[in-house]
Curated annotation (Swiss-Prot):
Coiled coil ranges: none
Family annotation (InterPro entries): B2Microglobulin, Ig-like_dom, Ig-like_dom_sf, Ig-like_fold, Ig/MHC_CS, Ig_C1-set, MHC/Immunoglobulin
Pfam families found in the cross-reference section: C1-set
Name listed for the protein in its UniProt record: Beta-2-microglobulin
Disulfide bonds: 45-100
Alphabetic keyword roster: Disulfide bond, Immunity, Immunoglobulin domain, MHC I, Secreted, Signal
Keyword Disulfide bond: yes
PANTHER family (UniProt xref): BETA-2-MICROGLOBULIN, MHC CLASS II-RELATED
Organism: Leontopithecus chrysopygus (Golden-rumped lion tamarin)
GO biological process: antigen processing and presentation of peptide antigen via MHC class I; immune response
Amino acid sequence: MACFVVVALLVLLSLSGLEAIQHAPKIQVYSRHPAENGKPNFLNCYVSGFHPSDIEVDLLKNGKKIEKVEHSDLSFSKDWSFYLLYYTEFTPNEKDEYACRVSHVTFSTPKTVKWDRNL
């Protein structure tokens, strides 16, 4: 019996060092409709393929966090990676820059992807 307890403890100790595989998120920033200056639109940031699920996503206007942002529920794909959609209403113009900033354990610093109005 004592041998079984020792073996069980060794197995548990070895398992505690295992960590889930980490996957960096793919970040896509796009508008719902083609950009037209002065015409209301939606800015989307689709973050996909990441693991673990703990993530921070911010939409930015001229480098500052946009406060009125909504998002989908956290969902997962067949491969157990996660995805989310963050979005907000905005009205594009020539001077403002928009971006999506993502913080995840796979990044040493937050990653920012700018919106390209021509995509």
